[in-house]
């Protein structure tokens, strides 16, 4: 237990928390341009073709972002909004593309959890 005088001389060191989405540079989202849209396979116990895109952000950093939802309209040169959030079974994928903004259309025929996929409320 340090004395007060010892703490005056040398204060306690702050614990620095490492960012989980460093490419966003403390922003909630960043805009970017798709450089490549492709599918990849997940880690060991899972099996699928996950849709991902390489995105060059406005700050010049290129990241791999996951395209959530069933079906998408993205291709090379599509302008997208990228948010943080990793995909547990895809190594190196630490970002998500926001559906329903810019060039990324919302998911079709989605009735539950619509706000997460940019889907409008269906007509009665």
Curated annotation (Swiss-Prot):
A Pfam family assignment: Ribosom_S12_S23
Domain of life per record: Bacteria
Gene Ontology BP annotations: translation
Gene3D superfamilies: Nucleic acid-binding proteins
InterPro entries: NA-bd_OB-fold, Ribosomal_uS12, Ribosomal_uS12_bac
Signal peptide: none
Location of 3-methylthioaspartic acid modifications: 89
A GO MF label: rRNA binding
Coiled coil: none
GO CC aspect terms: small ribosomal subunit
UniProt keyword terms in alphabetical order: Methylation, Ribonucleoprotein, Ribosomal protein, RNA-binding, rRNA-binding, tRNA-binding
Record-stated family: Belongs to the universal ribosomal protein uS12 family.
Subunit structure: Part of the 30S ribosomal subunit. Contacts proteins S8 and S17. May interact with IF1 in the 30S initiation complex.
Function: With S4 and S5 plays an important role in translational accuracy. Interacts with and stabilizes bases of the 16S rRNA that are involved in tRNA selection in the A site and with the mRNA backbone. Located at the interface of the 30S and 50S subunits, it traverses the body of the 30S subunit contacting proteins on the other side and probably holding the rRNA structure together. The combined cluster of proteins S8, S12 and S17 appears to hold together the shoulder and platform of the 30S subunit.
Protein name, as recorded: Small ribosomal subunit protein uS12
Species of the source: Moorella thermoacetica (strain ATCC 39073 / JCM 9320)
Taxonomic lineage of the native organism: Bacteria, Bacillati, Bacillota, Clostridia, Moorellales
UniProt gene name: rpsL
């Amino acid at each position: 237990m340090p004395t007060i005088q010892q703490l005056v001389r040398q204060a306690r060191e702050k614990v620095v928390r490492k960012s989980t989405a460093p490419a966003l540079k403390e922003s909630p989202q960043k805009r970017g341009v798709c450089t490549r849209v492709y599918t990849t396979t997940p880690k060991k116990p899972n099996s699928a073709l996950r849709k991902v895109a390489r995105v060059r952000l406005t700050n010049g950093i290129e990241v791999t972002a996951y395209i959530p939802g069933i079906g998408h309209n993205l291709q090379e040169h599509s302008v997208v909004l990228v948010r943080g959030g990793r995909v547990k079974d895809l190594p190196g994928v630490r970002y998500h593309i926001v559906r329903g903004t810019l060039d990324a259309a919302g998911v079709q025929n989605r009735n539950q959890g619509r706000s997460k996929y940019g889907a409008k409320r269906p007509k009665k």
